[in-house]
Amino acid sequence: MAGAKSEVIYLGDKDLNRNRHRDRDQSPEREIKILFFDLTHYNRTTQFLLCCGGVFALYLVYGYMQELIFTLEGFRPYGWYLTLVQFAYYTAFGYIERSVERTTVPRCIPLRTYALLAFLTLGTMGLSNSSVGYLNYPTQVIFKCCKLIPVLIGSVLIQGKKHGPMDFFAATAMCLGLILFTLADSQVQPDFNRFGVFLISLALLCDAAIGNVQEKAMREHRAPNNEVVIYSYGIGFVYLAVIMLLSGHLVQGVAFCARYPMETYGYAFLFSLTGYLGIQIVLTLVRTCGAPLAATVTTARKAVTIALSFVFFSKPFTIQYLWSGLIVVFGIYLNVYSKRSKLTFADLGRMASTVYRWVLRLPPAKDGGSRTSLLEV
């Protein structure tokens, strides 16, 4: 119309949907709970601070107790028995939570899927626990920080996902930092054991597979968290109990831990309880603040865990730990940033072409059109 003001609208702008998402997030029907504690009526900042405090407090105790258990003389061969006890605790915690909530929802995920999840969970936690007996604890934590590498491969193979260049840059940075950290550890640790590296590497492979299988199963069947915990750890407990019974390691583990009940079962209870509660809080943090922010918080927690490990448990230190650890942190930052940036390989090609033309002082290439569509009304 003549004389009317024209307004420019950006098609595909993320801000167009921002209010709709905000209204949905603030709807009264959406409950935010950590176990039996309702956080729905707190504002977003308070929810974030409470979740952060819980993550740091619980996982710092978790890491401390895990390393403390392996300081017990003679406990090193019993990492798998510790996993068996941990599975029993997790199953009990999940059953108690489900009973208190009085949930009568039938099982959502097929038993065949749970059988696979239990096997992968057993591999992840059993191999990870066993590696503590052979590796410097900070090295084990650094390996676990680099979970993105096998997860990236697993998501492509299992779910057929496509990833941008930032994800691959992040994985490359993590690989480099991991190699440098391991080399530094082998130089300062007189009892450096390659078998520990082998164990934690297998644990990461299982972790990558379980993350993708679990995500796919929970997305398709919409199973509650406590159901996944009960069946995954319950079936895993049966697997491991049968294997250890047939191999004779179950009797040996029971006999050893009977001599040190507080240092084994008592510490394992705190170790398992803090781990179980920590999982619930991380899931709540993901639900309220998003996965990138949750990844940032858990990464900061791991950095503090490594620092406290050097404080509470005497071990040699080299400045190479710091530099290689910072490279890993940079890789994690790139991974978090990739969730917000939709950079593609085509974008990289255009950027490289622009830089190439600028260096050679060539005229700019003709743009086939702006990526942002404009509509004038």
Swiss-Prot record:
Chief localisation class: Golgi
A GO cellular component annotation here is: Golgi membrane
Q: Which cysteines are joined by disulfide bonds?
A: none
Which Pfam families does this one have? UAA
Subcellular location per UniProt equals: Golgi apparatus membrane
One annotated GO molecular function: 3'-phosphoadenosine 5'-phosphosulfate transmembrane transporter activity
Identify the keywords attached in UniProt to this record, alphabetized.
Developmental protein, Golgi apparatus, Membrane, Transmembrane, Transmembrane helix, Transport
Membrane topology, as annotated, equals: Multi-pass membrane protein
- List all membrane-crossing ranges: 50-70, 77-97, 115-135, 138-158, 164-184, 195-215, 228-248, 266-286, 293-313, 317-337
Q: Which GO terms describe its biological process?
A: 3'-phosphoadenosine 5'-phosphosulfate transport; transmembrane transport
Its biological purpose is as follows: Mediates the transport of adenosine 3'-phospho 5'-phosphosulfate (PAPS), from cytosol into Golgi. PAPS is a universal sulfuryl donor for sulfation events that take place in the Golgi. Essential for viability. Involved in glycosaminoglycan synthesis and the subsequent signaling. May be involved in hh and dpp signaling by controlling the sulfation of heparan sulfate (HS).
By sequence similarity, the record places it as follows: Belongs to the nucleotide-sugar transporter family. SLC35B subfamily.
Q: What is this protein called?
A: Adenosine 3'-phospho 5'-phosphosulfate transporter 2
Q: Which organism is it from?
A: Anopheles gambiae
